[in-house]
């Protein structure tokens, strides 16, 4: 067995309770054979090959000596570029196509994450106090010099990167995420020596620390945690993304309040795998790893196993598969046998035990999936404790939807960019409202889910409400993402802040010359268009909506007046 210490952790147990963090070992199989059942090793070498879905192997990404991430082919090909097909000799604005009423605002968010040419030191004041330490570098706290918002920055030393492909995949996966319980990646910076990932700040500590502090949780407290974990998994699995290293150390509390939400972090082992496809690389952490991973053939239900282990620990304070060392732990995982044999389990309901058993089903093909988990009777009995949408909130939200519907397309995009950058304090109760609307827990809203909560059984009113909700669905797929929902519900006082507006303006001003041109607007809007692009006439009309001095551009003063509602 080859051990690779990924984080500064050690092992020490007393009376069956976890007392300190265990040493993490990564798994690798050189040639993935059925005989390598308990082999742990460093998964950095050739990671791009062994971690890809066995039916979805793709070409390796290209490297660059200095800007290995942001200038690599995979990221250049993924920048804003418009979806219509235009030859290099043509003016893209002369390529007239029918206008679609839909454009995907969430797609813009995914792209602006990697569109940063500033120096990190020009944008952030770095606090040298370390929030965490990993094999590649440190995580520190930082404050935006422009907005005052606090962030966490993961500083990665390039010389310590053994597998560039894994890091690229981590970033590409993270920038697709838009869920209340998945940590946000805001920006990526890079210089010759380091890579900087600007992340949502979560300073409430690890779930692991809470387990050490309290020992075990009541069923209701465990329910609140597991509901958030499974909702995040539902969202990921629907995108054919698996985390593969779920554990209490990778679950953070946003703050120190009693009802602080949690965020799932560390997507370094995450991978894509299509339905009915299997992966074969062996990665994970001994206590939480699924037995089928050790056998070298598994799918996204490996995350369900890990979640079942977490739920088990929450309810009793110790792991279902324990041992003096990693070898002993893995042998027990391979057998998949566990019991509810202590006094702790006497007070735990049969429903909770049944759900754990279904999550820890040894045969992963028969294991419960995340949709079935959230329909389990254990979850249903706590559902009545969720936020109840009252009539006052109904009226407020509907008014917000009306206001949002009246906004021009540019402002809708700008508001969406602003919504993505907000922290928990700015979002307020909207997060709980989103979760209350999300009946099936998949991390996105359907028009039907919102309509059922807000309708008043008045035909005329309900028709108007349904129409407004259709407008929130900007890409026409019937789903409303978390950031799209926040953007439609935000208090407009947020837009009065100059620094907030300036940041939104910079998203559109691609070359930083102080004005938004037709070409820049075309690049942004055509990228977010669904199936078709925008004609030259449409782009010109959008500019005219904001261009008060008719010079053909949108300067910052015009943009600010649009955002704040100030009229000439």
Curated annotation (Swiss-Prot):
Q: Which residues bind ATP?
A: 131-139, 154
Q: Which reaction does it catalyse?
A: L-seryl-[protein] + ATP = O-phospho-L-seryl-[protein] + ADP + H(+); L-threonyl-[protein] + ATP = O-phospho-L-threonyl-[protein] + ADP + H(+)
Membrane topology category: Peripheral membrane protein
The main place the protein resides is cytoplasm
- Report the Pfam families cross-referenced here: EF-hand_7 (PF13499), Pkinase (PF00069)
Residue positions binding Ca(2+) 2: 473, 475, 477, 484
Cellular localization per UniProt: Cytoplasm; Cytoplasmic vesicle, Secretory vesicle, Microneme membrane; Cell membrane
Query: GO biological process: what's one of them?
Result: intracellular signal transduction
Query: Superkingdom of the source?
Result: Eukaryota
Knockout mutant characteristics: Impaired replication in host erythrocytes. Parasite development is arrested at the late schizont stage before the rupture of the parasitophorous vacuole membrane rupture, however, the daughter merozoites are fully mature and their number per schizont is not affected. Loss of secretion of AMA1-containing and EBA175-containing micronemes. SUB1-mediated processing of AMA1 and SERA5, which is part of the protease cascade involved in parasite egress, is reduced.
> Motif J domain EF-hand interaction motif: which residue numbers?
409-418
Cofactor names: Mg(2+)
User: What does the UniProt record note about how this protein's activity is regulated?
Assistant: Activated by calcium. Upon calcium binding to the EF-hand domains, the C-terminus of the junction domain (J domain) undergoes a conformational change which results in the dissociation of the pseudo-substrate inhibitory motif from the catalytic domain. This, in turn, may facilitate the autophosphorylation of the activation loop at Thr-285, which leads to the kinase activation.
Enzyme Commission number(s) of this protein: 2.7.11.1
Annotated region (J domain) at: 400-435
| Keywords, alphabetical | ATP-binding, Calcium, Cell membrane, Cytoplasm, Cytoplasmic vesicle, Kinase, Lipoprotein, Membrane, Metal-binding, Nucleotide-binding, Palmitate, Phosphoprotein, Repeat, Serine/threonine-protein kinase, Transferase
What residues does the Protein kinase domain cover? 125-379
| Residues binding Ca(2+) 1, per UniProt | 438, 440, 442, 449
Q: How is it modified after translation?
A: May be palmitoylated. Autophosphorylated in vitro.
Q: Which residues bind Ca(2+) 4?
A: 547, 549, 551, 558
Q: Where is the active site?
A: 245
Report motif location: J domain autoinhibitory motif: 400-408
Outline what the protein does.
Calcium-dependent protein kinase which acts as a sensor and effector of intracellular Ca(2+) levels probably in part downstream of cGMP-activated PKG kinase. Plays a central role in host erythrocytes and hepatocytes infection cycles. During the liver stage, involved in sporozoite motility and thus in sporozoite invasion of host hepatocytes, probably together with CDPK1 and CDPK4. Involved in merosome egress from host hepatocytes, probably together with CDPK4. Required for the release of hepatic merozoites from merosomes in the host blood stream.
Q: Which family is annotated?
A: Belongs to the protein kinase superfamily. Ser/Thr protein kinase family. CDPK subfamily.
PANTHER family in the record: SERINE/THREONINE-PROTEIN KINASE
Name of the protein this chain belongs to: Calcium-dependent protein kinase 5
Identify the coding gene: CDPK5
């Amino acid at each position: 067995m080859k051990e690779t210490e990924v984080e500064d952790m050690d092992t020490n147990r007393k009376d069956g309770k976890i007392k300190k963090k265990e040493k993490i070992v990564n798994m690798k199989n050189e040639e993935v054979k059925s005989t390598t059942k308990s082999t742990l090793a460093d998964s950095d070498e050739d990671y791009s090959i062994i971690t890809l879905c066995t039916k979805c192997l793709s070409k390796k990404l290209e490297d660059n000596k200095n800007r290995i991430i942001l200038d690599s082919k995979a990221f250049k090909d993924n920048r804003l570029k418009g979806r219509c097909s235009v030859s290099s000799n043509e003016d893209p604005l002369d390529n007239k196509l029918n206008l679609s009423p839909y454009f995907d605002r969430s797609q813009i968010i995914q792209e602006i994450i990697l569109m940063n040419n500033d120096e990190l030191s020009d944008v952030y004041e770095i606090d040298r106090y370390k929030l965490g330490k990993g094999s590649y570098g440190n995580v520190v706290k930082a404050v935006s010099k422009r907005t005052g918002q606090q962030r966490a920055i993961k500083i990665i030393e390039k010389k310590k990167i053994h597998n560039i492909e894994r890091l690229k995949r981590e970033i590409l996966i993270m920038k697709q995420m838009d869920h209340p319980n998945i940590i946000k990646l805001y920006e990526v910076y890079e210089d010759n020596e380091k890579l900087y990932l600007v992340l949502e700040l979560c300073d409430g500590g690890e779930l692991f620390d809470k387990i050490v502090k309290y020992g075990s949780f009541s069923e209701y407290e465990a329910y609140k945690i597991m509901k958030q974990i499974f909702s995040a998994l539902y969202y990921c699995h629907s995108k054919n993304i698996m985390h593969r290293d779920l554990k209490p150390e990778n679950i953070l509390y946003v703050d120190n309040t009693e009802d602080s939400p949690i965020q799932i972090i560390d997507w370094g082992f995450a991978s894509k795998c299509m339905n009915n496809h299997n992966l074969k690389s062996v990665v994970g952490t001994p206590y939480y790893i699924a037995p089928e991973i050790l056998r070298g053939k598994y799918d996204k239900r490996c995350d369900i196993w890990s979640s079942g282990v977490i739920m088990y620990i929450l309810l009793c304070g110790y792991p279902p598969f324990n041992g003096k060392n990693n070898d002993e732990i893995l042998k027990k995982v391979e057998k998949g046998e566990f019991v509810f044999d202590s006094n702790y389990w006497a007070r735990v309901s049969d429903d909770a035990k049944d759900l754990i058993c279904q999550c820890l089903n040894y045969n992963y093909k028969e294991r419960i999936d995340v949709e079935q988990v959230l329909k389990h009777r254990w979850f249903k009995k706590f559902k009545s404790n969720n936020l109840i949408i009252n009539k006052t909130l109904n009226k407020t939200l509907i008014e917000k939807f009306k206001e949002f519907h009246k906004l021009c397309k540019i402002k809708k995009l700008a508001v969406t960019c602003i919504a993505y950058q907000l922290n928990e304090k700015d979002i307020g109760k909207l997060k709980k409202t989103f979760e209350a609307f999300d009946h099936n827990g998949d991390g996105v809203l359907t028009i039907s889910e919102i309509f059922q909560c807000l309708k008043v059984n008045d035909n005329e009113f309900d028709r108007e409400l349904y129409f407004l909700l259709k407008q929130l669905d900007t890409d026409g797929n019937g789903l409303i993402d978390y950031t799209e929902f926040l953007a439609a519900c935000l208090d407009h006082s947020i837009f009065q802040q100059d620094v907030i507006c300036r940041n939104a303006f910079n998203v559109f001003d691609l070359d930083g010359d102080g004005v938004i041109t037709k070409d820049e607007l075309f690049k942004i809007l055509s990228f977010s268009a669904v199936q078709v692009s925008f004609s030259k006439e449409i782009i010109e009309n959008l500019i005219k909506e904001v261009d008060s001095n008719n010079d053909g551009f949108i300067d910052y003063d015009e943009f600010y007046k649009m955002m704040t509602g100030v009229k000439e």
